[in-house]
Design a protein with these regions (language model features):
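Charge-dense, helix-prone N-terminal extensions
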Residues: 1-192
Length: 192
């Protein structure tokens, strides 16, 4: 597989949330993309956390996507303006609800949001049946936090129009849940 070389002119290092927000504030209207640099832990360099980076990006109508290795000490994640009309993930709806309540979302962006607030959460019947069919998964699922359940189930359900991907996500979730293991990013718990 060919190694992807990142354009050094599009790399941005923000050592904290405030500097990342300042960059977004100055570029969200005209910027097309930026690769936010995260230094690896062994370097000891300060950095904005993933959750902070996503929250600030949402405040300015941007979203996160691909992650690429830069070198031995760094990796970078692509951020770009969100395409109008694309749906928000469950995690981002929950983040946005909290950010709106705190008055952090830019007014221009707020006017375009519509209603990104969290939807009432229900486990789809087919996913619930799959969980119930595995006694270990069923028992462990009951113990997981409501936020974790919402995020993971929404992720699985988001692939419903791609049956192979839907099944792959569901099988992985069931396997991990049966082992009583949670996976994915952290930090979302603070919204509850």
């Amino acid at each position: 597989m060919a190694k992807i070389i990142l354009d050094e002119n599009k790399l941005l290092y923000a050592d904290n949330r405030k500097s990342w927000r300042a960059w977004l504030k100055g570029h969200y209207r005209t910027g097309r993309e930026v690769w936010l640099v995260y230094y690896k832990q062994h370097t000891g360099k300060a950095r904005v956390t993933y959750n902070e980076a996503v929250e600030e990006a949402l405040c300015f109508g941007w979203i996160d996507s691909t992650v690429r290795r830069v070198d031995e000490d760094r990796y970078a994640q692509r951020f770009s303006p969100r395409k109008p009309g694309t749906p928000y993930s469950q995690a981002n709806r929950e983040r946005l609800a909290a950010l709106i309540a705190k008055g952090k979302v830019a007014k221009e962006v707020l006017a375009t949001l519509g209603k990104p607030a969290p939807k009432r959460f229900r486990v789809p019947p087919d996913i619930l049946a799959a969980i119930k069919a595995d006694p270990a998964a069923r028992n462990n699922f009951r113990k997981f936090s409501p936020s974790y359940k919402r995020i993971r189930i929404a992720f699985i359900d988001g692939a419903r129009d791609r049956p192979a991907e839907f099944q792959k996500r569901l099988r992985y979730f069931l396997r991990m849940t049966a082992k009583n293991k949670q996976f994915g990013f952290g930090g979302i718990e603070k919204y509850y």
